[in-house]
Amino acid sequence: STVNQLFNGMKTSDSALIKKSFHKNAVLQTITRTAEVKNESINDFALSISKAEKESLDERIIFSNILIDGNLASVWTPYEFYYKGQFSHCGVNSFQLVKSNNEWKIQYIIDTRRKDNCKN
C-alpha cells in the first residue's frame, strides 16, 4: 500500500520512495505537545529522512481504521517510533489519500507525538 511504501522509504532512508508516496500538493503537519500545528514540506521531510542511517528509523504502525469513498480514503494508524532500536515516542497518524491516475497518493498527514501513554 501507499502508506507502507512511505514507511519502507523512511526505514531505508530512500527520499525518492518517500516522495513517490505523496500527491504533488500534499500537506504534512504535526501537532506538538502544546497543541501548536507545525507544517513541513514533503521535500524537507524526505531530505531529512534521507540523511538518517539506513534501518535506524522504524515507525511501527497499526492500521486501525480505513474508510474509502470513491477516490478518497482516510487512514488512522496508531504507531510507536524507534530510533536505532530504542523506543523514542508514540502517537497517531491521520492520512487522507486520493486516487489519481488509478494510484493512491497521500494528500495530507497530520500526526501526534508523545512519550507517555504508549504501549511499548
Q: What residue ranges belong to the model's regions?
A:
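A mature extracytoplasmic/lumenal domain signature
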Residues: 22-24, 32, 77-81, 93, ...
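Short beta-strand edge/turn micro-motifs at domain boundaries
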Residues: 90-117
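A short gly/proline-enriched turn/hairpin at secondary-structure junctions
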Residues: 27-37
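Short, aromatic-enriched amphipathic alpha-helices that serve as compact interaction elements
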Residues: 1-13, 21
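Surface-exposed, charged secondary-structure patches
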Residues: 32, 40-86
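Short, well-ordered alpha-helical segments enriched in acidic and aromatic residues
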Residues: 13-29
